[in-house]
């Protein structure tokens, strides 16, 4: 055992809301689908030296289970069905689905197994990696420093928004996966609760314990998996959008637009989808350009943009959120999800730019071709070419 062997995680609900939302949809629609996912560090950090400590934490995760009070709380939410929650009660993480190794200094992690199970690994595992690395690298950093940084930011925020009508400004905590620690995230969220514009968190455990609204719908993996689930690649994005509405016909209706670029998404997002979904989420590319495209698309379809919500969640901080609010607030409803810049903002601490992304579904490749080339992920060049052709995409620069 290492000196840092105490478990990082204490609750199965210490994860992002959209993981449970997607897991229920997978449970009902794609019970037998198998997937594989891989870890990526987008920065230059050599994290392989932490492999043993991370492997210990993975083993510890098998002891997490849904507690009775957590089950009761989930049961009271409007979108979970009894069959899924009863299954979730019996769910346990299976460490055999995870391989962790030190590949010449690089951290190598691969997940594989039934999608209904593998889907829950990503967020808590990233939170574990982030917290373990920061325990080693920054043992002197603490919660008080994180809170001081936030207080200074809130002073600047007040000055920045003086005289601005903030009644349509809505901020959410999206900071679980790259947080400095569980304790820092909870402290930051508790402080933000004092602000009228703070509306919720993506973390189900915090939402339950702090009586907050849990926030989240679906992630890239929902669209990626449909690239192999759908018999027609060109129709896969529409199939993903339709399947989501089958599971959630009138709630959790914010659609993620950049699995295969915003332009390709809008070509698939016709009047029925645009009417039924409550809005769209931005996660790559220029946010102003994206928002203008979204508003123009709604107007072209004869839909009032004021009846829809745009959610911005790509590398945001408070200043960027205010800039976007100034630009768009008179034309559309807005929400802003901030992650790392809230939950890992401590002097002399370098946040990790880490992800875990789907790479296979039923043994075949899947891809993410976002509006930021550096966020593109796929091993199989032939499949990327097929995807570009199916969605009539221009050439996309090579990315990590």
Swiss-Prot record:
GO biological process annotation, one example: NAD biosynthetic process via the salvage pathway
Keywords: Ligase, Phosphoprotein, Pyridine nucleotide biosynthesis
Entry annotated with the keyword Ligase: yes
PANTHER family, alphabetized: NICOTINATE PHOSPHORIBOSYLTRANSFERASE
Record keyword Membrane present: no
Name of the protein in question: Nicotinate phosphoribosyltransferase
Designated gene of the protein: pncB
Record family assignment: Belongs to the NAPRTase family.
Catalysed reactions, as listed in the record: nicotinate + 5-phospho-alpha-D-ribose 1-diphosphate + ATP + H2O = nicotinate beta-D-ribonucleotide + ADP + phosphate + diphosphate
GO cellular component: cytosol
Protein task: Catalyzes the synthesis of beta-nicotinate D-ribonucleotide from nicotinate and 5-phospho-D-ribose 1-phosphate at the expense of ATP.
EC code: 6.3.4.21
GO MF, one annotated term: nicotinate phosphoribosyltransferase activity
InterPro entries, alphabetized: N/Namide_PRibTrfase, NAPRTase_N, Nic_PRibTrfase, Nic_PRibTrfase-Fam, Nicotinate_pribotase-like_C
Residues carrying Phosphohistidine: 220
Modification after translation (UniProt): Transiently phosphorylated on a His residue during the reaction cycle. Phosphorylation strongly increases the affinity for substrates and increases the rate of nicotinate D-ribonucleotide production. Dephosphorylation regenerates the low-affinity form of the enzyme, leading to product release.
Pathway(s): Cofactor biosynthesis; NAD(+) biosynthesis; nicotinate D-ribonucleotide from nicotinate: step 1/1
């Amino acid at each position: 055992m290492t000196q840092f062997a105490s478990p990082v995680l204490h609750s199965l609900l210490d994860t992002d809301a959209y993981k449970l939302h997607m897991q229920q949809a997978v449970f009902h629609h794609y019970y037998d689908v198998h997937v594989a996912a891989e870890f990526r560090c987008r920065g230059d950090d050599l994290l392989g030296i932490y492999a043993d400590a991370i492997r210990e934490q993975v083993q510890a995760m098998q002891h997490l289970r849904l507690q009775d009070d957590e089950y009761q709380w989930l049961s009271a939410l409007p979108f979970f069905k009894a069959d899924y929650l009863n299954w979730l009660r019996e769910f346990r993480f299976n460490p055999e689905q995870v391989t962790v190794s030190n590949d010449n200094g690089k951290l190598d992690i691969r997940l594989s197994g039934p999608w209904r199970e593998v889907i829950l690994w990503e967020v808590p595992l990233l939170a574990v990696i982030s917290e373990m690395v920061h325990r080693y690298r920054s043992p002197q950093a603490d919660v008080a420093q994180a809170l001081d940084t936030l207080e200074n930011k809130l002073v600047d925020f007040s000055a920045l928004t003086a005289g601005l009508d903030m009644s349509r400004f809505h901020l959410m905590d999206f900071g679980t996966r790259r947080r400095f620690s569980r304790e820092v995230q909870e402290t930051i969220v508790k402080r933000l609760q004092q602000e009228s514009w703070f509306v919720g968190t993506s973390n189900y455990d915090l939402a339950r314990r702090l009586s907050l609204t849990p926030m989240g719908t679906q992630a890239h993996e929902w669209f990626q998996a449909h690239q192999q689930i759908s018999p027609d690649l060109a129709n896969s994005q529409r199939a993903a959008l339709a399947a989501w509405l089958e599971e959630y016909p009138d709630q959790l209706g914010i659609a993620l637009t950049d699995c295969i670029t915003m332009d390709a998404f809008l070509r698939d997002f016709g009047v029925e989808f645009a009417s039924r979904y409550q809005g769209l989420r931005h996660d790559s590319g220029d946010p102003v350009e994206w928002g203008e495209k979204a508003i123009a698309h709604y107007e072209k379809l004869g839909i009032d943009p004021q009846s829809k919500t745009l959610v911005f969640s790509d590398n945001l901080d408070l200043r960027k959120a205010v800039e976007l609010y100034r630009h768009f607030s008179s034309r559309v409803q807005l929400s802003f999800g901030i992650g790392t810049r809230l939950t890992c903002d401590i002097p002399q601490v370098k946040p990790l730019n880490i992800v875990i992304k789907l790479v296979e579904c039923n043994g075949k490749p899947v891809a993410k071709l976002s509006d930021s080339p550096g966020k593109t992920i796929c091993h199989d060049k032939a499949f990327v070419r097929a995807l570009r052709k199916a969605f009539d995409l221009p050439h996309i620069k090579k990315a990590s």
